[in-house]
Amino acid sequence: MAKRDIIKNQFHTYKDTYTGTNVTRLTEPDHVSHHMYFYNNMMTSDGKKLLYSAELNGERQLYLMDIETGDAVQMTEGTGVADYSGMITADDRYLIYRQGERFMKQDLDTGEEECFYETPEGWSAGGDLGPSSDYKYMSIVETRKDTTAKRKVGGNWDAFAENCLAKPLCRIVYIDMEKGTSRIIHEERCWLGHTQIRPIYGDKILFCHEGPYDLIDARLWCINIDGTGLTCLREQPSDLIITHEIWMPDGESVAYVYKETTGKMEENIRMIPMSTMKEEVFMNCSPYAHFNVAPSGKYMVGDSQGHDVPIHMLDHSKEKDRTGEVKNDFIYIVDVEARKEIKLCYHGSSWRAIYGNSQDTHPHPFFTKDSKHVIFTTDLEGKPCLYMAEV
């Protein structure tokens, strides 16, 4: 298949057994498909088209799906397409994605492309792209290749601890996507990830020290875009999991999931306002692996993990638990004003890294533009598929 080819997805709608929610499977379980990384902008402004990845004919490419008809246009071709990296610019004009070490901008109308940045020789680019709200700038992490751990074959978690302990030389790069210029913001011997430019303000970059929770010094870090003001946002003892931090849409606070592995085993959503830099407990929650915020800021959504064992420590040698037990693998909606959690539907993901990428079975839920649906990924019915639940 090639760029601009069209595939036709067959939708299947059902009522969730546990909540009665209407859920529509958007792709078919005979091949792997998933949406982009959960905080990427992957829908057009009118909410009618969805950017996702599908593995067909042995390779993963990006597709743009009409969520009313299921028709999807192939947007990329060739090897090395980073299947979680794509995003649509706020003005709906361009698709931004990474292919190998090249960062591409594709005109959605004409299909014309240009490379606006390429990682230098000897370095490798990470998968996460952190755009500014106006999509003029982007932050990424680059790692010097000769400092990383020797990764084992397969899209599993074997190298997660090894790469953390190797303390690779990483740097945060700030890119002007319009001018094609760049500068290095920060560099250190530590595995860095998840750079996110502060919404609205655009003055800071949130990033993490990546690796198992009991091996890193602290996960949450922030730095000004001029490279000054490096700040650890929160101390992190070795028995505490802090995960999947995000900016609130107004850029005023950083939010994240806090989970104790000893003592009271407390789990809740917490925030750090930039005005005070003092942590606030927002509300207790189910054991979310990831959570996201609606564009309006009125709702949150989380994918609960029924296993007590952290994802990277699961036994990934088998496909799924076959006991028939229904664990707390549900999608939850949070009413921000009421601080109330509501069970939306069962995602039933196996959480297993067996399809080629360790992220493939992660639900990674996010809201559609009008907040009337939540889209997520699960391998509930076969290989990972895209699902859309009515809120």
Where do the model's predicted regions map?
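Short, conserved, GDST-rich strand-edge loop motifs in beta-rich repeat architectures
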Residues: 4-6, 140-167, 208-217, 259-263, ...
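Blade-terminus and WD-like Trp-Asp/Gly-His loop motifs, strongest in beta-propeller folds
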Residues: 40-49, 85-94, 98, 128-137, ...
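Loop/turn-rich, solvent-exposed surfaces of beta-rich toroidal or solenoidal domains
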Residues: 283-342
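Conserved blade-ending motifs and adjacent loop-strand segments that build the rim/top face
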Residues: 237, 280-292, 339-366
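Blade-level signature of beta-propeller repeat domains, shared across WD40, Kelch, NHL, RCC1
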Residues: 361-391
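Asp-box/WD-like beta-propeller blade repeats and closely related beta-sheet repeat scaffolds
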Residues: 80-170, 184-187
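Blade/loop signatures of beta-propeller domains
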Residues: 2-24, 164-170
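Blade-loop segments of beta-propeller domains
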Residues: 32, 36-39, 57-100
